[in-house]
Amino acid sequence: ALNLSMRALVRPLHECSVLVIGGGAIGMFAALLLRRLGARRLCVTETNERRRASIERHVGCESADPRSAPPAEASHDFVIDAVGSKATRQDAFRAIRPGGVIMHVGLQDWASEIDMRKLTLAEITLLGTYTYTTADLRATVAALDDGLFGDLAWVEQRTLAEGPQAFVDLDRGASAAAKIVLAP
């Protein structure tokens, strides 16, 4: 997703204002990688207060609750929607600047209305990606092994028997984890 997006950016990543919508596993990985690739002005919006604190600690970037502090109109050059809901797509289109790039990754729901007029008149590039190549997977595993994503303290491990409670905790915002791994 990032390689495809960066080819479409008008300016180098380090000059861009970047917004990642969602601080789950996809959003956290994206933010960590964006920081590693040189993104200086980076914000992650996340509704879970505990995750926001984790994002600030592990990524070293600004975070915001989109419910109380939605992204400002035309405030970012590059937006990654790692959630994929109707509300986050609206946030992405509100936040993107003319000539900017929106990368849509999350698939939370089907509901969507895209402001085609804004897309056209503001010359916005809208990209989507779903899966990854074997080369992407190998590069990610190598990056994890090399410690490029930090100490992974933002990943929580629980037993398989604790799986149902893990989903409840994630849904209620009771966990700071961007990812919960269930082990047998």
Tell me the role of every PLM-derived stretch.
Residues 1-68:
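Mid-domain Rossmann-like dinucleotide-binding core that forms the NAD(H)/NADP(H) cofactor-binding site
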Residues 2-6, 31, 35, 77, ...:
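Predominant activation on well-ordered alpha-helical scaffold segments within soluble catalytic domains
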Residues 10-14, 52-125:
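Glycine-rich cofactor phosphate-binding loops and adjacent beta1-alpha1 units
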Residues 43, 101-103, 127, 181:
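Structural detector of well-ordered beta-strand residues that form the stable sheet scaffold
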Residues 47-48, 108, 132:
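Residues in the short beta-alpha loop(s) of Rossmann-like NAD(P)-binding domains
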Residues 90, 134, 138-184:
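C-terminal hydrophobic helical "lid"/dimerization subdomain
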Residues 101, 113-153:
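Rossmann-fold dehydrogenase core element
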